[in-house]
Amino acid sequence: MADVLTELPGVGPSTAEKLIEAGYLDFMKIATSTIGELTDIEGISEKAAAKMIMAARDLCDLGFKSGVELLRQRQSVWRLSTGSKELDTVLAGGLESQSVTEFAGMYGSGKTQIMHQSCVNLQIAGKIYADLEGVVEEELENPKAVYIDTEGTFRPERVVQMAEGLGIDGQLVLDNTFVARAYNSDMQMLFAEKIEDLIKSGNNIKLVIIDSLTSTFRNEFTGRGKLAERQQKLGRHMATLNKLADLYNCIVLVTNQVAAKPDAFFGVAEQAIGGHVVGHAATFRFFLRKSKGDKRVAKLYDSPHLPDSEAVFRITEKGIMD
């Protein structure tokens, strides 16, 4: 691996080892990095970092693409069922890869339940997708999920319960789900950055979950004086998640807390935390709210190509369903 990186200008065996230790295992990771990120590595100057990045981009053939090429790339997008056909219809078939989907809402609105259900559904992605579309899809090869838990709400027993509700082995789902408990924003960001290491070591990571996205940031950066610092750090975290979705054709799901809108006289009285940073970085944005009994309402209010729409789903012992 070190021999490959030495093809870059100014990279000898010693520098190559430092790059590998920092997680830069291939040209693509270097090509999509910033000068500031590379200069954090001891012994790499801004000038050397700039040369490495430019050379890596040339080797990866990064640049403009035609609309036809992008359309071809979009054909590799796959979808994962939420468990609710009505909600899947709003999403034109299910949760989409190469994108970040946000579910925001008050406590008890179903955010974490959707995250748990997604881990289960990943193990039968091909089967569920075939049921929805009426066509036979090639099943994912031993897909795995990463669940970064920032609020201590991941429950393996709930995953098993949902799996049994679909007639599959709950132990299989747990075996294929990597869970990390993040107690602060630095841990949260580090775990997200380490996902590439899991992929490089042979794990077919196809689902990444952050539950929840903003809780650690809210706890650490209090007051308006720290808002700019919080947003910059959150922006870097979202960039990491988007890069994972794009480079590895995986689905990224994030839950988000809400805050009251004091100026809201009509309509939704809460707004998702994170402001424009999260708003611009998330591909699909949902707002969840409680309804009667076990019913929940999911409103899609931001998407690059789908209309605003609502779906009603239920949270039962067996999991998410219509």
From Swiss-Prot:
Keywords: ATP-binding, DNA damage, DNA recombination, DNA-binding, Nucleotide-binding. CDD domains: archRadA (cd19515). The keyword Nucleotide-binding applies. The keyword Cell division does not apply. Pfam families: HHH_5, Rad51. GO terms for molecular function: ATP binding; ATP hydrolysis activity; ATP-dependent DNA damage sensor activity; damaged DNA binding. InterPro entries: AAA+_ATPase, DNA_recomb/repair_Rad51_C, DNA_recomb/repair_RadA, DNA_recomb/repair_RecA-like, DNA_repair_Rad51/TF_NusA_a-hlx, Hlx-hairpin-Hlx_DNA-bd_motif, P-loop_NTPase, RecA_ATP-bd. It comes from the Archaea. ATP binds at residues 105-112. HAMAP family: RadA_arch. Involved in DNA repair and in homologous recombination. Binds and assemble on single-stranded DNA to form a nucleoprotein filament. Hydrolyzes ATP in a ssDNA-dependent manner and promotes DNA strand exchange between homologous DNA molecules. Belongs to the eukaryotic RecA-like protein family. This is DNA repair and recombination protein RadA.
